[in-house]
Swiss-Prot record:
<comment type="similarity">
    <text>Belongs to the thymidylate kinase family.</text>
</comment>
<keyword id="KW-0418">Kinase</keyword>
<dbReference type="InterPro" id="IPR018094">
    <property type="entry name" value="Thymidylate_kinase"/>
</dbReference>
<keyword id="KW-0547">Nucleotide-binding</keyword>
<comment type="function">
    <text>Phosphorylation of dTMP to form dTDP in both de novo and salvage pathways of dTTP synthesis.</text>
</comment>
<feature type="binding site">
    <location>
        <begin position="15"/>
        <end position="22"/>
    </location>
    <ligand>
        <name>ATP</name>
    </ligand>
</feature>
<protein>
    <recommendedName>
        <fullName>Thymidylate kinase</fullName>
        <ecNumber>2.7.4.9</ecNumber>
    </recommendedName>
</protein>
<dbReference type="InterPro" id="IPR018095">
    <property type="entry name" value="Thymidylate_kin_CS"/>
</dbReference>
<dbReference type="Pfam" id="PF02223">
    <property type="entry name" value="Thymidylate_kin"/>
</dbReference>
<keyword id="KW-0808">Transferase</keyword>
<dbReference type="InterPro" id="IPR027417">
    <property type="entry name" value="P-loop_NTPase"/>
</dbReference>
<dbReference type="GO" id="GO:0005524">
    <property type="term" value="F:ATP binding"/>
</dbReference>
<keyword id="KW-0067">ATP-binding</keyword>
<dbReference type="GO" id="GO:0006235">
    <property type="term" value="P:dTTP biosynthetic process"/>
</dbReference>
<dbReference type="GO" id="GO:0006233">
    <property type="term" value="P:dTDP biosynthetic process"/>
</dbReference>
<keyword id="KW-0545">Nucleotide biosynthesis</keyword>
<dbReference type="InterPro" id="IPR039430">
    <property type="entry name" value="Thymidylate_kin-like_dom"/>
</dbReference>
């Protein structure tokens, strides 16, 4: 497949804690390189720039006072604005591909579903910060929250977000599914399957995307 004339594309991984995003990231990265795509910028949200990484710390850690859902949401969008304007858009304009660990769908699911913030507020912020900008492909790794959190708890200490109630994560998953089921630019992967099957499903989704991305 010819890939040297392909313009930059933005691929994003989404999913709950313990869904296997880190493993999936490496699977996709390897596949892109094997397809001849060598200029790949890797990002994560929140984070990805000096300021955004500081905001990530504020979002994920406990402080002397509770962090309100609205303050959390605004910090997430501040970090996202920095990353999109200073890293992602310049990379895409230069013909590079971007592989992201989370993007706006995370806020729609976690803050809209989990925190139950007003959808109109979320849509207004999204429009103000991102406008029509969106990933070319989103791969959502779907997993039962109880299974995902059990996996995540075995990987070290849980951060402030990961310590939310199980109901929080079930609401988040429900919103994720609502956002992805009828989204032509999104693919749902059953992350509860054996790793070999998950890997195959991810590779098939990426290959289909590459076929039409020329």
């Amino acid at each position: 497949m010819r890939t040297n004339n392909m313009r930059g594309k933005f691929i994003v991984l989404e999913g709950l804690e313990g869904a296997g995003k880190t493993t999936a990231h490496q699977i996709i990265l390897t596949q892109l390189k094997q397809a001849g795509i060598q200029q790949i910028v890797q990002t994560r949200e929140p984070g990805g720039t000096p300021l955004a990484e500081k905001l990530r710390y504020l979002i994920k850690h406990e402080f002397e006072e509770p962090i309100s859902p609205q303050a959390e949401l605004l910090m997430l969008y501040a970090a996202r604005a920095q990353l999109v304007e200073n890293v992602i858009k310049p990379a895409l304009s230069a013909g590079k591909w971007v592989l992201g660990d989370r993007h706006d769908m995370s806020s729609q699911a976690y803050q809209g579903g989990g925190r139950q913030l007003d959808v109109a507020l979320l849509n207004s912020l999204k429009e103000s910060v991102l406008g029509p900008f969106e990933p070319d492909l989103t791969i959502y790794l779907d997993i039962d929250p109880a299974i995902g959190l059990a996996r995540a708890s075995g990987c070290g200490e849980l951060d402030r977000i990961e310590q939310q109630s199980l109901d929080f994560f079930y609401r988040t998953r429900e919103r994720y599914l609502a956002l992805t089921q009828h989204n032509e630019k999104a693919v749902i992967i059953n992350a509860e399957q054996p790793l070999e099957k998950v890997t195959n499903d991810i590779q098939q989704a990426v290959q289909k995307f590459l076929t039409f991305a020329q």
